[in-house]
């Protein structure tokens, strides 16, 4: 009997000792773990952050419906980023909503949430609402930040995108691209011709509309730095002209008309100048700067080669462009006066459509080699060149405001049963997280706006 008791006590002591060791190790891990709110996230990471977006508290039916719509947009934004993994509301344990209480963090930990979003919506007058939201770090049981936005009812989608941007920024330390727009060329077929119209939409495909009527051939639309104008090339009677469309007033006017073929217009970062390419002589193309304040036109490139596709650096002091001056089509960099020209890329292959990243560390490009097209990025010193998108005809890269995401178009060959399809895709500059951006019709020549206020 004594021996049995001794054995039992020994087992109990072993169990107690094991529990003590587990608790000690757990506390040690917790003491040396950095909270989520201070982790720097990169899009190349495969592990997504589980996030619970609670329904925002609301009193009236109108506020309740708005709450559901806003939470749905926030969840969709964060989900497509592939950084976050929104948790289904069916799994939520805590039922209390709003921003006035401290969450029951154990309940959120039970469903493996690392980040919790609580909020409330209040109607403040006949047209306006106020939304307040709090970002909680469930792991550390601490508030990361809280903010409020006042908005008219028609801007609820934009407000939801703003909240998603704030969540992305405060958790990852990087800018989000959710409250942005995309302009592109939409192409459809009529009975006897292709109809090309400039279209604009939110980054998630919502609020889609056309800003040209399809009567004239249009190419290469770009946003102004303040997002209030679209610059593009329109062909009237087969003559190309650079036009500018005011998104606020709807006014549309010719900005510049040269002899020969004019294409590839680009705004300067301050919006006061534009660059265009013009070919008035056979096999010779030059880059011109147009001062929008004075109307003065300045030729930046010289010689008897093709110089085209200019792209300003973020500070406007340098310009990336394409030239065949070395015998093959390569990307060069010059200063904003046309001097100090340096070659960036080298063979094999031809390099076109340079796009300078807003963070000033990479230039995106289209590469053509042996009939194959690809999208890539390269550092400003010519190092770290890598291909991030391929398949048939990919072209026209444009950077999102975060300097990490690139949009481009991809054409699919026609088959016996299908016509040629041209679609828009976005991809991280590391080559991760490629996704299709839905458009009603064929789409090409995309350009990403800056962040909307």
Swiss-Prot record:
Location(s), subcellular: Periplasm
SUPFAM superfamilies: TolB, N-terminal domain, Tricorn protease N-terminal domain
Keyword Cell cycle: yes
Cellular component GO terms, alphabetical: periplasmic space
Family: Belongs to the TolB family.
Task of the protein: Part of the Tol-Pal system, which plays a role in outer membrane invagination during cell division and is important for maintaining outer membrane integrity.
UniProt name for this protein: Tol-Pal system protein TolB
Organism: Orientia tsutsugamushi (strain Boryong) (Rickettsia tsutsugamushi)
Gene assigned in the entry: tolB
């Amino acid at each position: 009997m004594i021996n049995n008791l001794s054995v039992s006590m020994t087992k109990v002591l072993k169990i107690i000792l094991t529990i003590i060791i587990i608790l000690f190790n757990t506390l040690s891990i917790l003491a040396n773990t950095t909270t989520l709110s201070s982790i720097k996230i990169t899009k190349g990471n495969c592990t997504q952050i589980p996030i619970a977006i609670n329904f925002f508290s609301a009193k009236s039916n109108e506020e309740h419906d708005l709450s559901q719509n806003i939470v749905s947009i926030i969840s969709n934004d964060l989900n497509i980023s592939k950084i976050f993994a929104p948790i289904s509301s069916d799994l939520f344990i805590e039922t209390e909503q709003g921003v006035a209480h401290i969450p029951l963090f154990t309940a959120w930990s039970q469903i493996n949430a690392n980040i919790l979003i609580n909020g409330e919506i209040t109607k403040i007058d006949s047209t306006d609402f106020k939304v307040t939201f709090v970002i909680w770090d469930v792991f550390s049981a601490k508030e990361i930040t809280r903010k409020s936005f006042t908005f008219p009812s028609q801007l609820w989608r934009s407000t939801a995108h703003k909240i998603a941007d704030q969540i992305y920024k405060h958790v990852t330390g990087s800018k989000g691209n959710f409250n942005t727009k995309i302009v592109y060329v939409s192409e459809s077929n009529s009975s006897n011709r292709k109809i090309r119209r400039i279209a604009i939409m939110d980054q998630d495909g919502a609020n889609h509309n056309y800003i040209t009527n399809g009567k004239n051939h249009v190419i290469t639309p770009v946003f102004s730095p303040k997002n209030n104008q679209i610059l593009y090339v329109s062909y009237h009677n087969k003559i190309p002209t650079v036009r500018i469309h005011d998104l606020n007033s709807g006014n549309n006017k010719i900005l510049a008309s040269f002899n020969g073929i004019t294409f590839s217009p680009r705004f300067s970062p301050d919006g006061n100048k534009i660059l265009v390419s013009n070919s008035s002589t056979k096999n010779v193309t030059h880059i011109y700067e147009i001062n929008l304040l004075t109307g003065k036109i300045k030729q930046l490139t010289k010689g008897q080669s093709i110089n085209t596709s200019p792209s300003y650096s973020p500070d406007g002091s340098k310009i990336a462009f394409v030239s065949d001056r070395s015998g093959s089509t390569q990307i060069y960099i010059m200063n904003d006066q046309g001097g100090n020209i340096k070659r960036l890329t080298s063979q094999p292959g031809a390099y076109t459509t340079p796009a300078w990243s807003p963070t000033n560390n990479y230039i995106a490009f289209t590469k053509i080699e042996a009939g194959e097209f690809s999208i890539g990025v390269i550092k400003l010193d010519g190092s770290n060149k890598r291909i991030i998108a391929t398949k048939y005809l990919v072209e026209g890269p444009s950077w999102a405001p975060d300097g990490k995401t690139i949009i481009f178009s991809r054409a699919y060959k026609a088959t016996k049963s299908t016509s040629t399809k041209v679609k828009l895709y976005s991809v991280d500059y590391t080559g991760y997280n490629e996704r299709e951006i839905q458009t009603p019709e064929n789409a090409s020549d995309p350009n990403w706006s800056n962040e909307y206020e």
